[in-house]
Amino acid sequence: MSQSQNGAELRLVTPGSAIGPVSGRRVGTGALIQGDEIIATRVGHVRERHGTVSVDPVASCYMPRSGDLVIGTVIEARSNLWFLDINGPFQALLPMSLAPWKVEFGGTRDHADINDSLLMRVQEVDEVQNVVATMKGIGLRRLAEGAVLDVDVQHIDTLRAEGAALLKRLRDLSDCRLVLADNGRLWADGDASGIDWLRALLRAVAAAGRSDRFEAILDAHAANAPSQGDA
C-alpha cells in the first residue's frame, strides 16, 4: 500500500472502511487499529509514509479545541471584549481580562481594532461551542507586521510531520519568520518577495487539494524562491 510519494492515485475511503492489515505499521491521523485491521475514521485518501498509515481528509473545517494556537481577526470590539473570526463555524471572544494590555472599559479599540490579527490560544470551548480565547501566554500578541496567509486545515498535519520538515523548508526558502496556527492560518514576516512566494505556493497547494501533493508542489516552486535556504 505504499502509494504516497510516487504520484499514484490514492485510495478514497469513508469512516469505517478497512484500509488493510496492521502488519507492523503505525497509525497516524484519520485512522485507528481495530483487531488486526487499520480502519478509517474520516473521509479521505489513504497515505502511507515511512511505515505510518494516515487518512488525509478531502476537506476539513477547523473545530476549536482548548489549548489550540489560533490567529484571529477582530470583527467587533465592544466595551469589554472583542469578537474574532477564527476560520471556523464559531467566533471566538476575547475578554479584556484575558488580553495582554491594561484596557480601560470602553477602550478596547485602542489596543486591537477591526481587522487586526491576534495570536491567541483557545482557553475554553463549552458544550454549545462558545469559544473563549486568551492572550495571556508567552509569544501571544497582536500581529502588527507581516501577513496572515490561509492554509487548508487538512494540510497542517503534513506541514508538521517529521519534526515540521516541510514548514522548515518554507521558512528557509521564503526567508520569512513563520507561525503556523491550528486554525489554518500562517503568519509570515519578511520581505514582500518571500511573502508573495508563499502566497503563490499555498494557492497552488489549495488548488491541488491533496496533502500528498504538497511536497511535489513545493519542489516545483523552490527554484523561484527568494532564498535557497540549506537546499
Report the location of each language-model feature.
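Single-stranded RNA-binding regions, centering on S1/OB-family and related RNA-binding modules
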Residues: 1-231
